[in-house]
Amino acid sequence: AAEGGLKYWKLAGTWLEEERAEYRLARSLLQAQNHASAVAHAERCVDVCIANNASPFERFFGYAVLAIAQLRGGDRPACAVSRQRALDQYAMVAADEKQWCEAEVNELRS
């Protein structure tokens, strides 16, 4: 379902929907324990954010899911870099948006 969502958001949506669909697919792949594919889609999520000068809120989620995927895939050094990038973005997230980041922040800090 997440793969289908990404396919159709690429056709019908903007970069924002594509980025969020990449995030959702990375999360689904983590649930399926397909860590390598999760990392690839998390990287794509981050790439879409960078290419479109996304807000810290969007970049936070990209780097967060990338760090989580890298950790679960056993790449601790890459995870440490992505984790720090996620937390750096989180520091710049608007106060009224921080509540939406709590689950990922907790996951990054555990």
Q: What residues fall within each predicted segment?
A:
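Amphipathic alpha-helical segments of tetratricopeptide repeats
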Residues: 2-10, 43-51, 84-95
